[in-house]
Each structure stands twice: as structure tokens, then as C-alpha cells.
């Protein structure tokens, strides 16, 4: 069963995926969304999927904090095609052995619209797996794009510990 959530203005959502449970979430950041905090704890042997779709028309802040316990598996997708700034902080703690996390994200980056993503997947136990696949499409009217322009358009920092 798919759990749906529409986010308006500034909201916080706390989710716990119970042991041996399976959950799927579709989260839509609505046009009036300015800030969304998502806190998720995936307990032992759980399986979860999250898809976050940004529709915010103005600057928005997205904060995601996840903790995965032993043999928990979580897959996440984030899609941001809006012509508005996005500040995205994403932190994942793989706390116990066997925890697995995968994120696939796509962003449309345009001139003078700042998209900043700070993403960390921290391996706090042996035999954990974390994968980050981030894609950015750069839409720019002039055909010449310098390295400086690209860095101003989209700043993505990934760290694996």
C-alpha cells in the first residue's frame, strides 16, 4: 500500500518502519511548501521506499535524516524540476550490520536559481551498503557554460564515511 503525503508551508514528518515491515511513501512538496523535515528510522529487517516530488514555487528547504538498523533496506527517489531555489540536507546513518540505502535523484538547474545539496551516508558498522546516484540537467539560454557558472548553478557535495 502506498502512503501519500502532501506538504504545505513548513512541516515535519517522523516515520518509524517497524521490524519486518514494508512501507512505501509518496511525498509531494506542494506549491506553497517552504520547509520540510523528514525523520525516518528503519528498524531491523524492514524494507521501505520513498519518493519525494518537489512542486514548490518559491525557495524551499528539504531536510532528510534517516537511521537504518540491522538488515534494513531503504530506497529513495527525489525529483526537483522546479524553477525555484532548493536547499537540501540529506543525512543517512547506517547504524548496524547489513543496513542498505540507495538514493536516486534528479534536478533541473537553471541560471540564477540556486540548488544546493549536502548529502552524507555514514557507515557506522561493517557490511553496510550506501549508493548515491545524483543527476542534474543544466538548462541555460546561452550555449557557452563555464565551470564557474556550473558551480554556481548546482552545488552537490557527497560524502561517504
Where are these regions (language model features)?
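Conserved beta-strand/loop scaffold segments within soluble protein domains that form the structured core
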Residues: 1-161
